[in-house]
């Protein structure tokens, strides 16, 4: 692993640790401390996610235009300014405005970071993106745990800790990346006929992202509707929190298992994703009969294995599909797809559960995951057809 990627991994860990001080506590803060309804809290979080989608697209575009260092620094500057504002102004309505700006700024950072990972270690393939993925999840585990402890003293300390960690992230990127060039990354697309195949590649990206949205829509239920369901059947909040602790530990420590599965059964990224989505289906199927904590724990363990196969594969494929000079845009597109799934998932799940119950939601999610498998199998069909056409044209000439 190149030194530049190691620095980026450390930076992303610090970044996500800081963000995770706040995001799990947003609803509690808005509802319990600001006195707003859960509906209002949901709308605020939707604004934050919507701004992140815009930031994802903007961050990818900026990476292609001004490079990784400037793009990430701009995103950090926007986010850091907003977080410093939250330290002093965290009442209503300043909170909603600043949290939305935080969503946009952090949204700029993520696709630029993924695109930079692919640029500084193009020969690393999935390993580069998997390293970023593991760092993010380690940050979520550490930040979520520490955030609850800090919030028990004062929410003001949560905002301060978030800002301080983001300031550290700023210095890591500034001193670690200002002399790194990312413009000469080797082309790793499926085809090198950009003029002929750019439309086919973008169509492949859209189809792939469609399945990615549905995957995240299903996954997001674990932190929303499924969380509420566990409370309704008598599983304590502390036990529910254990599920996410196990998730984080497995992601960090379970990489040898993922490597074994990939080498044994999933040499291609497409096969890796299909196996991952099938594992998702197994996990969600268990929820149809789950009534006790051990069943939810088993379902979470299985879900985590699936996500370790699917989530890092998508940015890797996007990097392979991207024509020269479009790496950032393609990363921004798949990042916005993930954010979009997380944004609409709670609303989708909430409506279904309110009107038809948890069983109807789970059955609907199983259908959506089957669609995700279909999109994964079909996303590159047009590219293969274009490649065949190019071969025939070259033979004829």
From Swiss-Prot:
SUPFAM superfamilies: MFS general substrate transporter. The chain crosses the membrane at residues 5-25, 43-63, 69-89, 92-112, 131-151, 157-177, 202-222, 233-253, 269-289, 293-313, 333-353, 360-380. Belongs to the major facilitator superfamily. The keyword Membrane applies. It is found in: Cell membrane. It comes from the Bacteria. This is Uncharacterized MFS-type transporter YttB. Its main location: membrane. It is a multi-pass membrane protein. Keywords: Cell membrane, Membrane, Transmembrane, Transmembrane helix, Transport. GO terms for cellular component: plasma membrane.
């Amino acid at each position: 692993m190149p030194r530049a990627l190691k620095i980026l991994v450390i930076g992303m860990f610090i970044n996500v640790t800081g963000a995770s001080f706040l995001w799990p506590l947003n609803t509690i803060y808005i509802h319990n401390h600001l006195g707003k309804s859960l509906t209002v809290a949901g709308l605020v979080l939707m604004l934050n996610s919507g701004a992140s989608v815009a930031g994802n697209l903007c961050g990818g575009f900026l990476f292609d235009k001004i490079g990784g260092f400037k793009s990430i620094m701009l995103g950090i500057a926007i986010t850091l300014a907003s977080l410093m504002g939250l330290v002093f102004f965290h009442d209503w309505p300043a909170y909603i405005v600043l949290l939305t700006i935080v969503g946009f700024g952090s949204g700029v950072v993520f696709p630029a970071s993924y695109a930079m990972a692919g640029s500084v270690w193009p020969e690393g393939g999935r390993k580069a993106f998997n390293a970023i993925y593991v760092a993010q999840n380690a940050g979520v585990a550490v930040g979520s745990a520490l955030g609850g402890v800090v919030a028990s003293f004062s929410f003001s300390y949560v905002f301060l800790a978030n800002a301080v960690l983001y300031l550290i992230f700023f210095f890591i990127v500034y001193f670690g990346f200002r002399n790194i060039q990312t413009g000469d990354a080797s082309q790793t697309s499926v085809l090198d006929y950009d003029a002929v195949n750019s439309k086919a590649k973008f169509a492949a990206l859209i189809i792939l992202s469609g399945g990615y949205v549905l995957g995240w829509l299903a996954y997001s239920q674990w932190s929303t509707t499924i969380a509420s369901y566990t409370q309704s059947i008598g599983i304590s909040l502390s036990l529910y929190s254990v599920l996410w602790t196990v998730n984080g530990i497995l992601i960090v420590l379970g990489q040898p298992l993922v490597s074994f599965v990939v080498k044994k059964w999933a040499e291609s990224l497409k096969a890796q994703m299909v196996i991952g989505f099938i594992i998702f289906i197994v996990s969600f199927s268990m929820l149809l009969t789950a009534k006790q904590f051990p069943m939810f724990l088993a379902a979470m363990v299985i879900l985590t294995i699936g996500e370790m196969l699917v989530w890092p594969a998508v940015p890797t494929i996007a990097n392979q599909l991207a024509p020269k000079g479009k790496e950032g845009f393609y990363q921004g597109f798949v990042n916005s797809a993930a954010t979009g799934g997380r944004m609409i998932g709670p609303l989708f799940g909430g409506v279904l559960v309110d009107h038809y119950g948890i069983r109807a939601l789970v059955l609907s999610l199983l259908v959506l995951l089957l669609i995700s498998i279909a999109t994964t199998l079909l996303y590159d069909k047009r590219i293969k057809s274009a490649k065949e056409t190019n071969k025939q044209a070259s033979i004829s000439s």
